UniProtKB/Swiss-Prot annotation:
Protein's job: Is required not only for elongation of protein synthesis but also for the initiation of all mRNA translation through initiator tRNA(fMet) aminoacylation.
Chain positions of motif 'KMSKS' region: 339-343
Protein family per UniProt: Belongs to the class-I aminoacyl-tRNA synthetase family. MetG type 1 subfamily.
Keyword Repeat assigned: no
Species whose genome carries this gene: Neisseria meningitidis serogroup C / serotype 2a (strain ATCC 700532 / DSM 15464 / FAM18)
EC number: 6.1.1.10
Cofactors (names): Zn(2+)
Protein name: Methionine--tRNA ligase
C-alpha cells in the first residue's frame, strides 16, 4: 500500500547564510525523502525561510531596506544554496505569507476558544531611545554570578549561568547602548502546563503506522525531565506574544501585539504544504485533520527539541489538528574535531563550497556516511573526507562502469547480454530489503557501509575475471560479454542503492544506462538484453588543493567582519603566532580547565578543553604520566601559550596552543600554579 507522507526540515532563519551545519539536516531529510519516492510512496518535502522577529527587523533597518525586501533576497540565496546541494524540496516557501498568517491566527483562536490562552501583565526591559521592548538577547551587561562583562540577557557564555535580563548588573541595550527601563506590558500565554497529560502520552507513545516511537530514546529521556514525573509537571506556560515594533503577524483583537516568532515558525510547515496543495491539487485536510491516517515527520536539530516535541504537538492537538508521526533530531557538526570556527576557516558556507567548485555530492555522501538514528554530533574530518570520497565513490563505485563500458561499446555494439542468472548479481539483489530498512530507519552510515561492501564484492569479481585480459584472448568474446554485462548490471544496482544520497550522479548514470530514471526496482531486477549509451565520466577525485582553497576562502570571507569583533573585546589582542625561535614574543594567558581527559590511543597525551575568557580552545599536552586521574584537573587555572601555531596531533585532532609545565628532577611534568584572583584571559608577564 502506498504511504502518504509529509516531511519537513527546520526552517532556516532569514538573517544569515546557509553553512554546512544546516546542510547536515537538509541532507539527512532529503536522503529519507528521496528513498521514500524511490520506493513509490507519495512523499512531499516542504520547507521555508523563518522570517519574523526582532533580529530580522533590526538587520533590515541596518541595511536601510524594508524587512519584506530583505527576506525575499535572503530566501533566494538560501534556496540557491540548498538547490546547489541537490536538496529536492517540493516547496520552499516563507513564513511571511498569507497562508501562514491565516493558520497562525486560526490556531490562536482555536486555542483561545479551548481556554488555552490567557493574558498577564509582565515586566520587561525597554529601550527608551529605540522605543521598543528588548528581547533577552538584545540586553547585555555584567553576569550576576561570575561578573563577566558583555553577557547576554538570558545566559552567561563564560560561566554558563542562566538568569533573567533584569538580573544583569549594569544592563544596556545591544541595539542603542541606552540603559533600559523596566516597564509593564500585557502579554499572551499558551497554557502549556495544562497540556502535560497529553504531552506525556504523546511523547512516550508510538505512531500507528508502524508502531515506532514518536521520539528517539534520547529525546524521550529529555522530555521526561521537562515534563516531570507522575502527576507533577515542570512545564511553564509559554509567552507567545511580543510588543510592537516587531516584524511578524499581529495577534487578533490585540493591537500592537505580535505573535512570537516561535509560534508562527512551525506553523510555516502547514503554510508551505498548503501552498503546495493549492498549486498541484493535494487534499490539505487529509494530512492535518485530527485522526489523519497520513504520516508527518519533522527533521530538526537537537537544540530545538523543546519547541517541536512539546509546544508544537500541543498547539496542533488543542487547536483540533493531528500531532506529528515522528520528530527526529540530529546532533551538531564539528570540523576536524572542533566547533566550526570562522578564524580557522572551518565555518564553511554552502555558497563558498559551491563557488570553489567542489562537487556537492561529495559532501552529501560524507555526511550521510556519518549519520545514524541517534542524536549524536558528527565530525567532518577534512582528510578523511578526501580519502573516503576518493576511495568509495571514485575507486569503488564509478570505476566499475568505467572498466566495463568500453568493452560493451567497442565489442558488442553497446548491447548487454542477459545475465539474470548471475550469482554475482544475486548477492547484490539479496541485500535490497536490508538496505531499504537502513534508509527507512535513518541508519545511513550502516546502509552505505553495506553498499560499499557490495561494491568490494563487485571489484573482487573484476580482479578475478580480468576483462582486459579476456579481451585479448581468442574465443573469449562470450565470456567477456557476460562479465562486462554483469558489471554494468552491478553498477546499476549500486546506483539504485546510492540514489537517495547521490541524486545527480544517479540521473547522469541513468542517461549512460539508457534508462528513464533509476528506481528502487533496479536493486532487484537485471537489465536484460539492453542497449546502453556511451560512458561519460561520472565523478572526479577530490584534490587536497580544493579543500585547502575552500578553507582559505572562508578565512578571507570573515576577515573584515572579524576585525571589529576583536577590537571590541575587553581583552588585549592575542599576539601573532610564534615559533620556538620567537619564544620571547610568546603571548601567555591564564586559562581555566573546563574538562580534561585521557586520549584514546595515546599513553602520553591529555586533552584539555580550556576557557581563555575571550574564547574556548582545545589543547593536547604530553603530561599523562604525571596525572593518571585527569579529571582532578577540572576547574583548575593553568598558564598556556595563546599564540602558538596550531599543530595537528596525528589522528587525535588539532592542538591550539601549549600548556606550560615544569620538569621535575624525577623527569615528571607538573603544571604551573596560578594565584587566586587570576581570571581566564589574564595576560602573564
Amino acid at each position: 500500500m502506498t504511504r502518504k507522507i509529509l516531511v519537513t526540515s527546520a526552517l532556516p532563519y532569514a538573517n544569515g547564510s546557509i553553512h554546512l551545519g544546516h546542510m547536515v539536516e537538509h541532507i539527512q531529510t532529503d536522503v529519507w525523502v528521496r528513498f521514500q519516492k524511490l520506493r513509490g510512496n507519495e512523499c512531499y518535502y516542504c520547507c521555508a525561510d523563518d522570517t519574523h522577529g526582532t533580529p530580522v527587523m533590526l538587520a533590515a533597518q541596518k541595511q536601510g531596506i524594508a524587512p519584506e525586501d530583505m527576506i525575499a533576497k535572503v530566501r533566494e540565496e538560501h534556496l540557491a544554496d540548498f538547490t546547489g546541494f541537490n536538496i529536492g524540496y517540493d516547496n520552499y516557501y516563507s513564513t511571511h505569507s498569507p497562508e501562514n498568517k491565516q493558520f497562525s491566527q486560526d490556531i490562536y483562536r482555536a486555542l483561545k476558544a479551548n481556554d488555552k490562552i490567557e493574558s498577564r501583565v509582565i515586566e520587561q526591559l525597554f529601550d527608551p531611545e529605540k522605543q521598543m521592548f528588548l528581547p533577552d538577547r538584545f540586553v547585555k551587561g555584567e553576569c550576576p554570578k561570575c561578573h563577566a562583562q558583555d553577557q547576554y540577557g538570558d545566559n552567561c557564555e563564560v560561566c554558563g549561568t542562566t538568569y533573567s535580563p533584569t538580573e544583569l548588573i549594569n544592563p544596556y541595550s545591544a541595539v542603542s547602548g541606552a540603559k533600559p527601563e523596566l516597564r509593564e506590558s500585557e502579554h499572551f500565554f499558551f497554557k502549556l502546563g495544562e497540556c502535560a497529560d497529553f504531552l506525556k502520552a504523546w511523547t512516550s507513545g508510538n505512531n500507528p503506522h508502524d508502531g515506532k516511537p514518536h521520539l528517539q530514546p534520547e529525546a524521550l529521556n529529555k522530555m521526561k525531565e521537562w515534563l516531570g514525573e507522575g502527576e507533577e509537571t515542570t512545564l511553564s506556560d509559554w509567552d507567545i506574544s511580543r510588543d510592537a515594533p516587531y516584524f511578524g503577524f499581529e495577534i487578533p483583537d490585540a493591537p500592537g501585539k505580535y505573535f512570537y516568532v516561535w509560534l508562527d515558525a512551525p506553523v510555516g510547515y502547514m503554510a508551505s504544504f498548503k501552498n503546495l496543495c493549492d498549486r498541484i491539487g493535494i487534499d490539505f485536510d487529509e494530512y492535518f485533520k485530527a485522526g489523519s491516517q497520513t504520516e508527518m515527520y519533522h527533521f530538526i536539530g537537537k537544540d530545538i527539541l523543546y519547541f517541536h516535541a512539546l509546544f508544537w504537538p500541543a498547539m496542533l492537538h488543542f487547536s483540533g489538528h493531528r500531532a506529528p508521526t515522528g520528530v527526529y533530531a540530529h546532533g551538531f557538526l564539528t570540523v576536524d574535531g572542533q566547533k566550526m570556527s570562522k578564524s580557522r576557516g572551518t565555518f564553511i558556507t554552502a555558497k563558498s563550497y559551491l563557488e570553489q567548485g567542489l562537487n556537492p555530492e561529495w559532501m552529501r555522501y560524507y555526511i550521510a556516511a556519518k549519520l545514524n538514528s541517534k542524536i549524536e554530533d558528527i565530525d567532518l574530518n577534512l582528510q578523511d573526507f578526501i580519502s573516503r570520497v576518493n576511495s568509495d565513490l571514485v575507486g569503488k563505485y564509478v570505476n566499475i562502469a568505467a572498466r566495463a563500458s568500453g568493452f560493451i561499446a567497442k565489442r558488442f555494439e553497446g548491447k548487454l547480454k542477459d545475465v539474470s542468472d548471475s550469482a554475482l548479481l544475486a548477492k547484490l539483489t539479496a541485500q535490497s530489503e536490508a538496505i531499504a530498512e537502513c534508509y527507512e530507519n535513518r541508519e545511513y552510515a550502516r546502509a552505505l557501509r553495506d553498499i560499499m561492501a557490495l561494491a568490494d564484492i563487485v571489484n573482487e569479481y573484476v580482479d578475478a575475471n580480468k576483462p582486459w585480459e579476456l579481451a585479448k584472448q581468442e574465443g573469449q568474446d562470450e565470456r567477456l560479454h557476460e562479465v562486462c554485462s554483469e558489471l554494468i548490471n552491478a553498477f546499476t544496482m549500486l546506483t539504485a542503492y546510492l540514489a537517495p544520497v547521490l541524486p545527480q550522479t544517479a540521473t547522469n548514470a541513468a542517461r549512460f544506462l539508457n534508462l528513464d530514471a533509476i528506481t528502487w526496482t533496479n536493486t532487484r531486477v537485471t537489465l536484460g538484453k539492453h542497449a546502453i549509451n556511451k560512458y561519460k565520466h561520472l565523478m572526479q577525485r577530490v584534490e587536497q588543493k580544493q579543500v585547502d582553497d575552500l578553507i582559505e576562502a572562508n578565512k578571507q570571507s570573515i576577515a573584515a567582519a572579524a576585525a571589529p569583533a576583536a577590537e571590541e573585546s575587553k581583552y588585549e589582542k592575542v599576539a601573532e603566532q610564534a615559533s620556538f625561535d620567537d619564544f620571547m614574543k610568546i603571548d601567555m594567558r591564564v586559562a581555566k580547565v573546563l574538562n580534561c581527559e585521557a586520549v584514546e590511543g595515546s599513553t602520553k597525551l591529555l586533552k584539555f578543553d580550556l576557557d581563555f575568557g575571550f574564547e574556548k580552545r582545545i589543547i593536547f599536552s604530553g603530561i599523562a604520566a604525571s596525572y593518571p586521574n585527569p579529571a582532578e584537573l577540572n576547574g583548575r587555572m593553568v598558564i598556556a601559550v595563546a599564540n602558538f601555531a596550531p599543530r595537528k596531533m596525528a589522528k587525535f585532532g588539532v592542538s591550539e596552543g601549549m600548556i606550560l609545565s615544569a620538569a621535575t628532577a624525577e623527569g615528571k611534568l607538573k603544571l604551573l600554579d596560578v594565584d587566586a584572583g587570576a581570571q581566564p584571559g589574564d595576560k602573564v608577564g
